[in-house]
Amino acid sequence: MSQILFKTKTFWYGIALTFCIATLSYFLAKLPFLMILGQLVTAILIGIIIRALFPVPEKWFTGIQFSNKVILRAGIILLGFRLNLVDIYHAGWRVFLIAALCLSFGITIVYFLAKLFGVDKKLAILVACGTGICGAAAVVAISPQVKADNNQTAVAATIIALLGTIFTVIYTLIYPILPLGPDGYGIFAGATLHEIAHVIAAADPGGSSAVDMAVIVKLTRVALLVPVCFVVAKMVNAGTKNRFSWAELPVPWFIFGFLATSAINSFGIIPTSVTDFLVICAYFLIAMSMGGLGLNVHLPSFGKMGGKPFAAALIGSVFLSAFGLALVLLFHLAG
C-alpha cells in the first residue's frame, strides 16, 4: 500500500506544495514585519491562507499528511544535532515536573469546561488530550481508546490545529514583554502549546537555547502519551466487556531518534560544520510540516462543528498558559 502511495502524482503534489510553502516562508520571514514571527509561524499562516483562498485537491492531502507526520518527525530527529544532553541534566527535575503538571492541568481543565458546556464525552476527551499532550497526534492516538468516530476525531484535530496556531502567533508577539529569559520562555512554550511544531515555532524568537528547552519539555509531554492512553482506555472500558489491549497503545518512537542524535552531538562525534547543516535541514523539514499544518485548518468547518468544544479548548488553553507561566516563575526558572 505504501509503495502505491509513493508512486501517485497527487502524493508528490502535496509534498511539493509544502516544500514551496517552506521555501516561501524562508524568504518572507526576512521581511521586517514578519521577522518577529519567524519562518515556522509564517509557514503556518501561508498554509492557512492558501487553504482559505484556493481549492486544494483532496487527493493532495496524502502528501500533505506525510509532511505533517513523517517529515515533521524527521525534522525533530535532525534537530537533536544541536542539543547537548549535559544541558538537559542541568535543567533538573523541576523542568520535567512542570511538563507533567501542565499536561495534567491541561487535560483536566479542558475536559471540565467541555462537559460544563455540554460537549459530547468522547469529543471532550479528544479535545482535552489534544490540548494537554501533543495536539492532533494525541487526538488520533486517543480516538480508538474512546471509540470516537471519524467526524469527532476530525473536529478535535481541527480545533487543536487552529488554537495552536493562534497561540503560537500570540506567544511570538508577547515574548518581548514576558518576564522570561530564553530558557524560561522555552520551558513555558514547551509546557503549554499544543503541537510539537507549534512549540518549535513559538520558541524560535527566543533563540537556540529557547528552542532546545522547549523541545525537551514538549517531548516529555509526548512521552507521557502512552500512560495517558492507558488510563483513558481503562476509564472508558470500566464496567464494560471491552478488553484492554497493550498493542493498541501508541509509542512515539521518534523520541529515541531525537535522543540518539542529541547524544551524538553531545559527544562531538560529528564536526560542527556538519551538524550546523543538519540543523538547517531540520528547520526546513519542520517548516514543510508547518505548511501542512496550516493547510489542514479548514476555517468554514467551524461553522458546522459548533462553538462549544472550540470555546472550551480556547478558555482551557488560556488557563493552561497562565498556569504554565506561574509554574516557571514559581520554580525560579524564568532566566
UniProtKB/Swiss-Prot annotation:
The chain crosses the membrane at residues 10-28, 33-55, 91-113, 123-142, 155-177, 251-270, 277-299, 309-331. One of its GO terms (cellular component) is plasma membrane. The keyword Membrane applies. InterPro entries: Na+/solute_symporter_sf (IPR038770), UPF0324_pro (IPR018383). Keywords: Cell membrane, Membrane, Transmembrane, Transmembrane helix. It is found in: Cell membrane. Pfam families: Cons_hypoth698. It is a multi-pass membrane protein. Its main location: membrane. Belongs to the UPF0324 family. This is UPF0324 membrane protein LMOf2365_2179. It comes from Listeria monocytogenes serotype 4b (strain F2365).
